[in-house]
Regions:
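Active-site neighborhood of phospho(di)ester-bond hydrolases with catalytic His/Asp-centered motifs
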Residues: 6-7, 32-36, 74-78, 122-123, ...
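A general structural motif
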Residues: 1, 27-30, 69-71, 118, ...
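Internal, conserved structured core segments that host functional sites
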Residues: 76-90, 111-126
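Beta-strand-turn-beta hairpins that frame and shape the catalytic cleft
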Residues: 1-4, 115-122, 201-203
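Conserved beta-sheet core of the metallophosphoesterase superfamily
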Residues: 170-232
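Active-site environment of divalent metal-dependent phosphoester hydrolases
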Residues: 10-14, 39-43, 79-85, 128-130, ...
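Active-site-proximal loop/helix segment associated with metal-binding centers of metalloenzymes
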Residues: 96-100, 104, 112, 117-180
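Core catalytic region of metal-dependent phosphoesterases/phosphodiesterases
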Residues: 14-98
Length: 234
């Protein structure tokens, strides 16, 4: 069975998912794993229309795929976690009413922290040696684990501007997975850290190839080449 893994979307579902549709057809994809960060984009924290359109598009797309026999797994990204916790971050949408509407939309996506794909542990940012996956990470997130999600949301390493030794599986920098590898889970697939392309030659594979930055002319530019990862279980 073939699985398609998709990195951070950041309000680009309407741009990326039509491309994904073609890949589903071409490669006979039966499972899709989104690695989180569906929300928030530099310079768009007041763009209510973009949040509404993109998230409703994503939700409708997921329902359509599931109705057509495709399994769709949605993982939690660091940006998503603050909505689930009901705590606005500086990069969250600023309108409070819309913030909580986004929270409900994210809950409708049925999010979880991690997914085990054969030998590969899949998560938003990756598990370094400081964090091991817990049973609840592989199940639908519920309020029962709010305190634990809060810890993940606020454990940020120095490479991401925090004070912890290393980041949680929502916040770990890709370099942390190289410098502080989790020996129990050497093979991982992660997003979060922008990559120019996908390199499958190493144990830890980064697939965040859709990230943008704003250039000196105040225009959006892609950091990566838009690669997607197809995993074939044979």
């Amino acid at each position: 069975m073939k699985t398609l893994l998709i990195g951070d979307l950041h309000l680009k579902s309407q741009l990326i998912l039509p491309i994904v549709d073609k890949i589903i057809q071409t490669h006979n994809i039966k499972r899709i794993i989104f690695l989180g960060d569906y929300v928030d984009l530099h310079g768009q924290t007041n763009n209510i229309q973009l949040y509404a359109k993109d998230l409703t598009f994503l939700y409708s797309w997921k329902i359509d795929k599931e109705q057509n026999g495709i399994d769709v797994i949605n993982l939690i990204g660091n940006h998503d976690a603050y909505y689930l916790l009901g705590e606005q971050a500086p990069f969250s949408i600023q309108n409070l009413e819309v913030f909580f509407a986004v929270k409900e939309l994210l809950q409708d996506l049925k999010l979880q922290v991690a997914y085990q794909l054969d030998d590969y542990l899949v998560s938003h940012a990756g598990f370094n040696l400081i964090f091991d996956p817990k049973e609840w990470h592989f199940n639908l997130y519920t309020k029962e684990h709010e305190e634990e999600l809060d810890i993940l949301a606020y454990t940020i390493g120095p490479m991401r501007g925090g004070k912890a030794l290393g980041g949680s599986p929502l916040w770990a920098h890709f370099r942390e997975l190289e410098l502080l590898p989790n020996q129990e889970f050497p093979k991982q697939i992660v997003g979060h850290t922008p990559k120019e392309s996908i390199d499958i030659s190493k144990n830890v594979i980064g697939i965040d190839t859709f990230s943008l930055y704003i250039d000196k002319d105040n225009k959006y530019q892609f950091i990566g080449n838009g690669d997607l990862l197809v995993y074939d279980q044979g």
